[in-house]
UniProtKB/Swiss-Prot annotation:
One of its GO terms (biological process) is regulation of transcription by RNA polymerase II. This is Zinc finger protein 80. May be involved in transcriptional regulation. It comes from Pan troglodytes (Chimpanzee). Keywords: DNA-binding, Metal-binding, Nucleus, Repeat, Transcription, Transcription regulation, Zinc, Zinc-finger. Belongs to the krueppel C2H2-type zinc-finger protein family. A zinc finger (C2H2-type) spans 49-71, 77-99, 105-127, 133-155, 161-183, 187-211, 217-239. One of its GO terms (molecular function) is zinc ion binding.
Length: 273
């Protein structure tokens, strides 16, 4: 006996159900819309997949499956060098470039390279002069969204993300999440060599180097070694004189983000980045 096919939960069943409904109503499946697409094509295009946990909707089942990893906590992509794991391959590849120093995204104007396309797109605004973020209060325009957010606070005084434990405020939720570990005592990063635990992954990774090869990134100018490629990049500016962080209030440039952030706090009333 062949299994009963009620069509529930299958693509074929869903499509058959749609066909039956259209036959009963007399709809013409092969009638075209204004763009030349038949109705059966439109039915297939509009089929959606909904997450039962949060209600997010996707047009492909594969996207839903990938999204559900956020709720399940599954992180199948693990980088062996540091042990950090990611739910999606794109995040894994992005993290891997921190270790390898790979920067595949190149600016066609000045040949400067970046490890992320989003960083390149932001940087290109220096050449184009584009300032897409405009303050509705004073009319000032900004190239970067982060700088725009910092400026906006000077008008509104809004506290974007506040710690309920100590009242400290932050521009970004990720900064608040990182800060909260101070209060919870959470130390999710454990060294497999000696058993030590760490609150922050960056500190854990630096510690793990004491068991292995030390500092893999070396400055060609002075020979100083670093744990991370971005630390080497930051150090290199002391030789080149590059100052990529500009305060738009006073047109002052900085070689390090920490110095730029300190200057920004002066304008924003002391709020942390």
């Amino acid at each position: 006996m062949s299994p009963k096919r009620d069509g529930l939960g299958t693509d074929d069943g869903l499509h058959s159900q749609v066909l039956q409904e259209q036959v009963s109503t007399g709809d013409n499946l092969h009638e075209c819309d204004s763009q030349g697409r038949s109705k059966d094509t439109l039915v297939r295009e509009e089929k959606t997949y909904k997450c039962k946990e949060c209600g997010s909707v996707f047009n492909k089942n594969s996207l839903l499956v990938r999204h559900q990893q956020i709720h399940t906590g599954v992180k199948p992509y693990e980088y062996q060098e540091c042990g950090k794991a990611f739910p999606e391959k794109v995040d894994f590849v992005r993290h891997m470039r921190i270790h390898t120093g790979e920067k595949p995204c190149k600016c066609v104007e000045c040949r400067k390279v970046f490890n992320r396309r989003s960083h390149l797109l932001c940087y290109r605004q220096i050449h184009t002069g584009e300032n897409p973020y405009e303050c509705s209060e004073c009319g000032k325009t900004f190239s970067y969204h982060s700088v725009f957010i910092q400026h906006r606070v000077t008008h509104t005084g809004e506290k974007l993300f506040g710690c309920k434990e100590c009242g400290k405020t932050f521009y970004y939720n990720s900064s608040l999440t990182r800060h909260m570990k101070i209060h919870t005592g959470e130390k999710p990063c454990k060294c497999s060599e000696c058993g030590k635990t760490f609150t922050y992954h960056s500190v854990f990774f630096r510690h793990s180097m004491t068991h292995t090869s030390g500092k893999p990134y070396e400055c060609k100018e002075c020979g100083k070694g670093f744990y991370y490629s971005y630390s080497l990049t930051r150090h290199t500016r002391s030789h080149t004189g590059e100052k990529p962080y500009e305060c738009l209030e006073h047109r002052k440039a900085f070689g390090y983000h920490s110095a730029f952030a300190q200057q920004s706090k002066i304008h924003s009333g002391g709020k942390n980045l």
